[in-house]
Regions:
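Phosphate-group recognition and catalysis centered on beta-loop-alpha active-site segments
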Residues: 1-159
Length: 159
């Protein structure tokens, strides 16, 4: 059986944070799943919901804030509010974390509610920049997004 750490080690640590991913890497897992959105300034950011209020202390949509503004929101899980590894991070931060690890990364493109312009291309470009094509699975509840991914890169694995 192949086990993925859903949103990192989210049972114990704040979901979709660098801390949750770092702790997941200590486990006997096949891969990590995460969710990606785009900030107002076009950065690929790691967070599950379109709105920040469930996981961070703040209000509003991810798309309405720049990455620097998003970094100012504190995690709302008790005991982790002041941990820098529990802030909204960039996809490239996770790539730097896993690039030398024997791990698969499932990137869920979150554009089923908000249609982020060119998010598929931006994700694929970053994957190529880091030479991580063999470690990546792309998923989405938006079937058109998966079709777009395959059109842009027929070799990338989708699920």
């Amino acid at each position: 059986m192949k086990v993925f750490a859903h949103r990192g080690f989210s049972y114990k640590y704040p979901e979709n944070t660098l801390l949750a991913f770092k702790e997941a890497l200590k486990l006997d897992i096949y891969g990590i799943e995460l969710d990606v959105h785009k900030s107002k300034d076009g950065k690929l950011v790691i967070i599950h919901d379109e709105d920040i209020k469930r996981t961070f202390k703040g209000e509003g949509k991810v798309k309405d804030y720049t990455f620097e503004e998003l970094r100012n929101f504190k995690c709302n899980k008790e005991g982790f509010e002041n941990n820098d590894d529990c802030k909204i991070s960039l996809l490239e931060d996770v790539f730097n974390l896993i690039k030398d690890k024997d791990i698969v990364l499932n990137i869920e493109i979150k554009n089923d509610v908000i249609d982020y312009e060119n998010i598929e291309k931006d994700v694929l470009d970053l994957i190529k920049e880091y030479n991580l094509e063999r470690k990546i699975l792309i998923s989405s509840f938006n079937h058109k997004a998966l079709e777009k991914v395959k059109k842009l890169n027929g070799d990338i694995r989708i699920c």
